[in-house]
Swiss-Prot record:
The protein, known as: Replicase polyprotein 1ab
Enzyme superclass (EC): transferase
Organism: Canine coronavirus (strain Insavc-1) (CCoV)
Keywords carried by this UniProt record: Methyltransferase, Transferase
Domain of life: Viruses
Entry-linked Gene3D superfamilies: Vaccinia Virus protein VP39 (3.40.50.150)
Protein purpose: The replicase polyprotein of coronaviruses is a multifunctional protein: it contains the activities necessary for the transcription of negative stranded RNA, leader RNA, subgenomic mRNAs and progeny virion RNA as well as proteinases responsible for the cleavage of the polyprotein into functional products.
One Pfam family linked to the record: CoV_Methyltr_2
Length: 168
């Protein structure tokens, strides 16, 4: 018997992922972190490719519901255009995740991704600075990779407020 109703191929979705990807590219500080929920049928090719532009990234499954395809793409220390690693195609990344998820027997757990020994995220008291693009050098990129530095994007005007209507 079928357990899921599937109406076509399982392809990359846009929807809200367009906004998540835009936020990471345009507003997330260099050195910042992100966690985005994905499932077998709710995923995005570009997001998989973007998450590889973090110094450390993984897909984390909570195992609370072992029959679920839910996972979280975790990215730590965003490098953006300063990432020098090869980027794997997002469709291949998702296929690998689904294969791994469907072939791995998981025991129930409630562990946090931050509790796992291999997770490289530590509290580092990162310094937050404004730097121009021309001021980024190998030393600065090294500090980003180690989580010692956050660089605000001071080239864009960001306007946030708590009002739904702007009144002159």
């Amino acid at each position: 018997p079928n357990t899921k109703s599937i109406d076509g191929e399982n392809t990359s979705k846009d929807g809200f992922f367009t906004y998540v990807n835009g936020f990471i590219k345009e507003k997330l500080s260099l050195g910042g972190s992100a966690a985005i929920k994905i499932t077998e049928f709710s995923w995005n090719k570009d997001l998989y490719e973007l998450i590889q532009r973090f110094e450390y990234w993984t897909v984390f499954c909570t195992s609370v519901n072992t029959s679920s395809s839910e996972g979280f793409l975790i990215g730590v220390n965003y490098l953006g255009p300063y990432c020098d690693r090869a980027i794997v195609d997002g469709n291949i990344m998702h296929a690998n995740y689904i294969f791994w998820r469907n072939s791995t027997i998981m025991a129930l757990s409630h562990n946090s991704v931050l509790d796992t020994p291999k997770f490289k995220c530590r509290c580092n008291n990162a310094l937050i600075v404004n730097l121009k693009e021309k001021e980024l050098n190998e030393m600065v990129i090294g500090l980003l990779k180690k989580g010692k530095l956050l660089i605000r994007n001071n080239g864009k005007l960001l306007n946030f407020g708590n009002h739904l209507v702007n009144v002159p």
